[in-house]
Amino acid sequence: MSNTLSATVNSTNQRMGYRAHVPGREPLLLDYVPPFGDDNGFTPLELILVALATCTGSGVGILLRKKNKTVSHIEVTAQGDRAETHPTVFRTIDLHLTITSPDVVPEEMESVLRTAETTVCPVYVMLAASVEIRVGFTLKNS
């Protein structure tokens, strides 16, 4: 993978609609909620939550499987609390991972999460520099 990533967005209307293009990928629609937009796509802040959840979940999954753990399902929910005035940045983000596995124990999960948060997930590392991220997990036996 190249060290340089790129994305281009083009407006789709006279309001806040955009179509995002990343080379080799399907386009993605972005928009804002009324009154500024038409609510026809993800908002940029929603995509930040999606990126964080995906990056963290992927990192945890890779690390657990490297430890020869059986992981049948990973669900990550992300919820961000925004500032009330502009810029309406995230003040805090809560991540919750639900790992379905017959052989992952809480101590391993805590260790894997620390590694994912500090080494494996670049989205987490970038966001944690400016946002408090609180992480929890649930282990489900499969």
Question: What are the roles of these predicted feature ranges?
Answer:
Residues M1-V50, G61-S142:
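Extended beta-strand/beta-hairpin segments
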